[in-house]
């Protein structure tokens, strides 16, 4: 059945900002969808609020709107563009919920827009817990005993009927948000309360606990002729109770019997038919009892999901691409398999290798968060590895996580019986470190029965881990490392570093082991991912390494450039770096064979047809060097680009160069000039530029000396980190003493992992009340091109990755911009940059200070590119390959005159706002972790607001980042520190003029009353122990108060917005309780005066709801006209 001819234009909704449970996989799926639609001659209208995505590049759609995914905005775009159809199944839960809201508001009917990919009814049946339960029953399958609740009273009745433990699952949420396992009434009330709040339909499913059962997933696709294929079965190594996104998962399934698998297939096919997904894909999760084989259907996603991306990368079967074609009316037998180019999509993929996915967590960013893994997803990223067997695949996946001590290690003394007993107790509770603890217990003598009893991980997987330990012990104890033994170690997934440690050689021994391995002729070979277990030839070069006999690499003629990706998403190194890598691949592919190396299954860069060759491999020195050596034999290699993937590839630069690998762009020595504090100080000195007073320290005594010389407050951080990890503002000796030991230990441990010499602790003068600026620029050795000058909305002290910023800057003078331009030129020249550089500055009392410089792609490059209409990373790639800025102006990649530092009257304003994951992280007693922003980055993603002026653009950024955006009326609670009280009267007057009622604590109300400003007084909250947010709460009744504290009012829904600035010492007493309650209630809250002032401007601007909606294609045309007029 050929495609439908009545659909001429399609609107695609993206997934918005990267959040836990919904990450880069939807950029991958959305990009595939846009490419398919355009290939089919269909006009594409794309809406997504996330600028750091490939799908929002202007060439991906005919009209691209970087706008909030909110019903009023979507209606404006629909009214303007008049699409024939809406495709919501490739943008995660955000797009599904947006489509449902448009349907319920009558917008789709009003503008005659058809929903394709899944109907509203199918979405409802798949997402609504009660309706889905009926579908499962009708399919002849079994659900866990369960009931629906919409209130805590109903929840209690269900608990009486079923008993504990109980699983809470909200309707219409993603990543298990608001879900959890309750073992008693207190936990049930806490989890169910959150679940009801986060569900847009105020609905939760309460079901019997099935913890410890085995968990499986099926990815299915169905066309309108009722053809169904099972793309990939996935097995969770962790049993039911840990969210699949937080579990180690494998494909194919290892512990299912053939009969069980066939039964899962039959149930899955019956469910996809029953739900009504007839032009797309879905993901279904099952639980299987380990002894009886009883099967329970857990849930489904009637859309492309995170697991779909994993299944696509694991098999080479492009689920999102095929789902888009199905939505257009094609059938599975009409769609060709791109990889074989000879089989149809109705052929189910077969794999002859093992795929393992390992999650990456960020608990270190959220002190106090409960590290227990539950049904609510907490991981921020994931890595995937392919190999010939499970042991090798697991070892590769664990080292792909790129986190200290995430691979198995046998350092130190063998655990004692007492320690083994402690470890067995610890692994009862699933945490990020469970597998490392489990291996240590095995090393110490724990039996398989003991480990199974503690974890309920299937014995098949445990046996494999026991075998890895057995091999490690053989390596450790052998007199000599024979070729046979070294190969056995490799087949067990052990890296050269792990073997070196087992042999007592430490990190330095990695080179010794590699040289020995090469002497033995023991090198990995590279196999092809072909979807058909080598039944047909693969046309696409998508490779993984393993220790087998024959390589499948093919010779090539063109010179190649190898680009190192950024690995798993994490806080501080996210999708922005994949964006720059993809741009480099796209641009350099015109003249070179591009070779991509990455291990993140969520990303566009790991799409099989994005580069000329794709290596799905860990980003470690060993793995990258082997790829380079293998590619050298296949054809000429110009070099490796390490500048685009963030800190991970950058940390390999020096060792790769020392091993004879040519590094393109900025050299490792030049990178060191910017990152080594002493060397960078010399660069600034020559350029006659100011830096905050600073010192370095390798001991507490040195740190004290430096802090006293500089003067408090100081900013303390380890060297060579990304995302401000370990960074803190310190106000006195006591705080410094507490910080130093931990920070020093982290810095030294990191240097061991990255192969660097021990690096010092950096101590800077903290610039209070300064304006912070980010500058992204290109430099070719002679000419500078400013990509963008971004002014932070918050004052200095908030990490640039968490700060809101505006481009063009809103308060900088022409003279200040000139000084920024001259300073950036001097730094780029002094550091011998070739390619991208990011410099962070601060203006304090009109004195310009340089905070730091990074000679690499920064996380603001995508934002600056979208705001200025210039693909900076594409130009950077060509400069790294030896071309000049003048060449890029000539070929049209850069503006013929001027650059992104020029401000044109009438230019649209872009505001970047960060999205923070605080609602995901709770303390052991259920409170959210504190949201105070500081110098350590904690955001997972970003959005962009785009409009005619700063107030409108800022309002859009808030609407995109937070459900509902900013209120235009209602009640505002204000509590500010003593320093901020002098700015309070003007703010309060503005609030009154805008029609808000003010609520305040006694001290703040007293200040306001002196200026004749009325406010309602609320009781103050304080905790007995200032630093302990879990301490019991005492309430102090203030004179004239309403008899309630602000937390009571927030919980009663009587507060609409909060300004709560902490005192300078970061006291967490009152502020913590207020901020935690506000997170639970999803209220807009501000912890800096400057951002609250911006919010007031925004509220004033949007009271009339007159947003300007402009596509980025229209924006680029407008910019070009303004530039032409000016020059």
UniProtKB/Swiss-Prot annotation:
Region of interest (Carboxyphosphate synthetic domain), ranges: 1-402
Residues reported in the UniProt entry to bind Mn(2+) 4: 852, 854
The UniProt record lists the keyword Thylakoid: no
Pathway field: Amino-acid biosynthesis; L-arginine biosynthesis; carbamoyl phosphate from bicarbonate: step 1/1; Pyrimidine metabolism; UMP biosynthesis via de novo pathway; (S)-dihydroorotate from bicarbonate: step 1/3
Positions annotated to bind Mn(2+) 2: 299, 301
Region annotation (Carbamoyl phosphate synthetic domain) ranges: 552-962
A Gene Ontology biological process term: 'de novo' UMP biosynthetic process
Binding residue positions for Mg(2+) 2: 299, 301
Binding of Mn(2+) 1, residues: 285, 299
Domain MGS-like: start-end pairs: 964-1127
Gene Ontology molecular function: any one: carbamoyl-phosphate synthase (glutamine-hydrolyzing) activity
Residues reported in the UniProt entry to bind Mg(2+) 3: 840, 852
Top EC class, one word: ligase
Positions of region (Oligomerization domain): 403-551
Residue ranges of the region described as Allosteric domain: 963-1127
EC numbers, comma separated: 6.3.4.16, 6.3.5.5
Record-listed Mg(2+) 4 binding positions: 852, 854
Binding partners and assembly: Composed of two chains; the small (or glutamine) chain promotes the hydrolysis of glutamine to ammonia, which is used by the large (or ammonia) chain to synthesize carbamoyl phosphate. Tetramer of heterodimers (alpha,beta)4.
Chain's role: Large subunit of the glutamine-dependent carbamoyl phosphate synthetase (CPSase). CPSase catalyzes the formation of carbamoyl phosphate from the ammonia moiety of glutamine, carbonate, and phosphate donated by ATP, constituting the first step of 2 biosynthetic pathways, one leading to arginine and/or urea and the other to pyrimidine nucleotides.
UniProt similarity note: Belongs to the CarB family.
Protein name from the UniProt record: Carbamoyl phosphate synthase large chain
